Structures are given as structure tokens and as C-alpha cells.
């Protein structure tokens, strides 16, 4: 049996409203549980369009055929009109996810703002964004938030420090191999991190890998004897690619791949996890910096 964590990022209003119910049905059909990370504040994701001026981001959008993949309502959200408040209007879907037995955590208050500004915000601004998101999601769920995942994997040592006071059991803020405890500025171990170590759809699909070949590509990358942490998006696998994701789940079962929530990948005693650094790095297929484990 190959153990794998399944992380579902929910970035937008439409992804929550339309993608999450579909994914809940698919996971129920497969008898699986996963971790859902919700964005709960305003949906301003359309404001990323200014990044088209950057060649790497423009190429990513063209390579993944973003307009057909996401839809124009997602690509324009929060541009000509105020972003819709996701948690306030769609909180019942977050409670439904929790009631179905899935792990639920915080992705962001404002996904666009975090992905754009996390690298330059002050410690106070970082903490305020985390607090707003955590308080909102806790009010929706009726219980404290126990885990989080930085939007766009935009995390570094400052983000690690900012999350320390919130009592999360773990965070999934970076890319890399194996769960670890990040080293804080004073040398002590921080809240455990569960990194993602498999590529996402939008990072690899393009001229060299057509959509139809993606399932073959990704399934070959799950391996026994290690943590496999895989991320999908409600805006992709919950919408246009839902049939392909359903087939991926079926094929994964035949290969002995068993998906579970990320929290179940942690040892009973987190003190057994190794210490490592969480630093800024680069990853093929992504525009800009992101958090990576080192070493």
C-alpha cells in the first residue's frame, strides 16, 4: 500500500460553490477523506491579471490554457467589482465538508493579497491576515482551526514565526520532502510542516504534456516508503477536470495508492520529526518565489 496525503486548495468563490460539492461527491464515492484548505475572505483572484506582464506568468497561463481551465468568472473576480465574501456566503459548504469527515484548514483570508504581498508585509500584517482568516473559519466551523496552508506556498521564516501563536497542529506552507519541524529564529523547533512533494496540474501541463496524459504522468510519481503529498484545486479538479480526477482516483486505488488527510501523515510524537529550514526558493512551472524545505 502506498500512503498519500490529499490536499485540496479552495481559492475562489466559484471553486467553493461549485467545485467543493463535486469533490465531496467524488471522494464519498471512492470512500476517501482529504484535507480541504479554504480561502474565506474576499475573492480578488482576478487581480492576478496584472502579472500577465511577467513572461513566466504569461507562459504559465498560455501553457495551461487558463481561460478554458478556470473560466472567465474566476479570472476576472474582484477586478471591476468588489470580491465576493467567500466565507460569509458559502460557510455552510465548509461545515458540510467538516461534517463529511474531512480535515478542514485555513488557506487564506484574501488569497490574492497573500500571494502578492506576503513577501513584503510586516510581521504585524502577516499576523493580522492569519488572525482574520482563522477567526472567520473558526466561527464558521464552530471550533478552532487546527491546520493551515499558505496561499501559493508563499512562506518563509517570517511566515513560520507569524503562525506560531495560533495553535495550529501543523502547517503545509512549502514544497519539499517529508514532514519536518522548521527551525525558528531562536533555534527552537516550530509547528510541524507537511510539505507538498508532487507537482500540480498547472505546473506541468503544456506542449510537452497534454491534459489527456496527466493522470499517467502523476500516478507514476507516487512511491512507496516515503510521504506522498498531492495537491489538487477545487477550481480545476472540482470543475472542468472532475471526470479526469474521478478516473485518477479509480486508477490510484488499483495501484494501491491510498489517499488520506495530511494530518494523518504526522507521527504521534512530533518531536521525532527532523529539524530543517523553511526558506524561499524556486520551482519549475511556477512563477515567482515559494517556500521550500532546506535541506
Swiss-Prot record:
Signal sequence residues: none
Keyword hit for Lipid biosynthesis: yes
Gene3D superfamilies per the UniProt record, alphabetical: Glycoside hydrolase/deacetylase
Pathway: Glycolipid biosynthesis; 4-amino-4-deoxy-alpha-L-arabinose undecaprenyl phosphate biosynthesis; 4-amino-4-deoxy-alpha-L-arabinose undecaprenyl phosphate from UDP-4-deoxy-4-formamido-beta-L-arabinose and undecaprenyl phosphate: step 2/2; Bacterial outer membrane biogenesis; lipopolysaccharide biosynthesis
One cellular component term from this protein's GO annotations in UniProt: membrane
Swiss-Prot/TrEMBL keywords: Antibiotic resistance, Hydrolase, Lipid A biosynthesis, Lipid biosynthesis, Lipid metabolism, Lipopolysaccharide biosynthesis
The organism's place on the tree of life at top rank: Bacteria
Domain NodB homology: 2-260
Reaction(s) the record says it catalyses: 4-deoxy-4-formamido-alpha-L-arabinopyranosyl di-trans,octa-cis-undecaprenyl phosphate + H2O = 4-amino-4-deoxy-alpha-L-arabinopyranosyl di-trans,octa-cis-undecaprenyl phosphate + formate
A UniProt-annotated Pfam family: Polysacc_deac_1
InterPro entries in the record: ArnD, Glyco_hydro/deAcase_b/a-brl, NODB_dom, Polysacc_deacetylase_ArnD
Single Gene Ontology BP annotation: 4-amino-4-deoxy-alpha-L-arabinopyranosyl undecaprenyl phosphate biosynthetic process
Top-level EC class: hydrolase
EC number(s) stated in the UniProt entry for this protein: 3.5.1.n3
GO molecular function: hydrolase activity, acting on carbon-nitrogen (but not peptide) bonds, in linear amides
Family named by the database record: Belongs to the polysaccharide deacetylase family. ArnD deformylase subfamily.
Known function: Catalyzes the deformylation of 4-deoxy-4-formamido-L-arabinose-phosphoundecaprenol to 4-amino-4-deoxy-L-arabinose-phosphoundecaprenol. The modified arabinose is attached to lipid A and is required for resistance to polymyxin and cationic antimicrobial peptides.
Protein name according to UniProt: Probable 4-deoxy-4-formamido-L-arabinose-phosphoundecaprenol deformylase ArnD
Organism expressing this protein natively: Pseudomonas paraeruginosa (strain DSM 24068 / PA7)
